[in-house]
A protein has these predicted regions:
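Residue-level signature of transmembrane alpha-helical entry/exit and packing/kink sites
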Residues: 2, 6-10, 93-102, 109, ...
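PDZ/PDZ-like domain micro-motif
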Residues: 136-150, 168-169, 233-246, 265
Length: 448
């Protein structure tokens, strides 16, 4: 069922993004007087189609990995262009119209992101305060003088009020060499203490990096004691006699102070039996359990009892319509720049290409965010929409950015780029995009 849910959420997520993108092309083309012959979501065999009032065929196709808008064009051997309808063909349009039509797809993705973020910001944001809960021994954070209890209020001069805000600010520094400036102190005051943390090609080789943990910081989360919150039917823990509410004191003589201690202990011991000492309603009970082996990782089918988060550790931000709109535009701009910078760092070899993700990863994230709530899924949708818009603006033939380059050259030269050059460029671009997609899928499979 989980696989089916992931597939459905991937189809819904990609379907929304592709439809919005292609609708941008379609809407501007119709405003420019260009006849649209076909508006397709997906590729390959047509599953369902209908005729629009303007004569456009709308189609849903079998391979849901994209879409396209086919316009009347003299260069298309299948399209019958006469003197009567030549003005409705794409290639007969002035350069400004061509540029507007091509750029409308990515613009629609950015607009979708702004609208989604506007709704989320208007609804209000809630996040964990970026309080330092732990500093790893001998970590760069400890060596720099950071201590437990401080709150990160700025990263490189950018104000940060939540854990996610700190994470995003740190992610901007992936692959960099220099120093990260952290300002810590009281979030209610503008006065803070600054720490300079040296970095060299920071996390350049890391896959799915956790920037705070890389510095040796645990932010926002209160220490979680090893208390049983749930048990899986048929799991090793249930079979061993564990009960909800049991607090794990030790395992095989090793003290268990936090839930992470217990998880690491169990994961390292598949098919190995050991005794566990628990506190059950004030009495100590000894149980014997053997973790099941799941891909060489031990598991006992046990969930943690999460503590209540005190209100002092929660940051809430509400905005009015104008402020929410401004914040949505600014966040979209920041994420767009971050996307371009990350791609450029990848080209330079400053960050690992293992961070490229394909449709499998999108399906997994779409499913997990949907399970976390509608607002979380919408946040992912906005982020993915920005990524789609940015990628399509890359100056690669076949992508919208490549078409934009050709039309800019046409405007400068006063004539279109020779068709043979365009065809050869599109073939090279198609090969590059296909190779990139295969590499991303390879990364997805390697993570499974």
């Amino acid at each position: 069922m989980q696989i089916l849910f992931s597939i459905v959420m991937a189809l819904v997520t990609l379907g929304v993004l592709v439809t919005i993108h292609e609708f941008g092309h379609y809407w501007v083309a119709r405003r420019c007087g260009v006849r649209v012959l076909r508006f397709a979501i997906g590729f390959g065999r047509t599953l369902y189609s209908w005729q629009g009032r303007d004569g456009t065929e709308f189609a849903l196709c079998a391979i849901p990995l994209g879409g396209y808008v086919k316009m009347l064009d003299e260069r298309d051997g299948e399209a019958f262009v006469t003197e009567a309808n030549r003005s409705e063909s794409f290639n007969a349009q002035p350069v400004r119209n061509k540029l507007a039509i091509v750029a409308a797809g990515p613009a629609a993705n950015f607009l979708l992101a702004v609208m989604v973020l506007f709704g989320l910001f208007l609804r209000g944001e809630t996040g964990l305060a970026p309080v330092i809960e732990a500093v790893a021994v001998n970590s760069v954070a400890q060596q720099s003088g950071l201590v437990v209890g401080q709150e990160v209020i700025a990263v490189d001069g950018q104000a940060t009020s939540t854990v996610s805000g700190v994470r995003f600010a740190l992610l901007k520094r992936l692959g960099d060499t220099g120093q990260i400036d952290l300002t810590v102190g009281n979030a209610l005051s503008d006065v803070g203490q600054r720490y300079a943390i040296p970095i060299v090609n920071w996390l350049g080789e890391a896959e799915a990096p956790d920037p705070a943990a890389a510095l040796g910081l645990s932010l926002g989360f209160l220490p979680i004691r090893p208390e049983v919150g749930s048990l899986s039917e048929g799991g090793a823990a249930a079979g061993a006699g564990f009960e909800v509410g049991d607090v794990i004191i030790g395992a095989a003589g090793v003290p268990m102070a936090q839930w992470t201690d217990w998880v690491e202990f169990v994961r390292a011991r598949p098919n190995q039996r050991f005794d566990v000492l628990v506190d059950r309603a004030g009495s100590q009970v000894t149980l014997s359990v053997m973790p099941q082996n799941r891909n060489e990782i031990g598991t006992v089918g046990m969930g943690v009892a999460l503590p209540e988060i005190p209100d002092s550790r929660i940051r809430r931000q509400s905005r009015g319509p104008i402020e929410a709109l401004g914040a949505a535009v600014n966040r979209t701009y920041e994420l767009t720049i971050f996307t371009f910078e990350s791609m450029w760092k990848m080209v330079q070899g400053l960050i690992s290409t293992k961070n490229l993700s394909g449709p499998i990863a999108i399906a997994q994230i779409a499913a997990s965010t949907a399970e976390s709530g509608f607002a979380t899924w919408l946040s992912f949708l906005a982020l993915l929409s920005i990524s789609l818009g940015a990628i399509n603006l890359l100056p690669i033939p076949v992508l919208d950015g490549g078409h934009i380059v050709f039309h800019v050259v046409e405007g400068l030269m006063g004539r279109p780029v020779p068709e043979q050059i365009q065809i050869m460029s599109f073939q090279v671009g198609l090969a590059a995009v296909f190779t990139l997609m295969m590499f991303a899928i390879y990364n997805d499979v390697a993570r499974l």
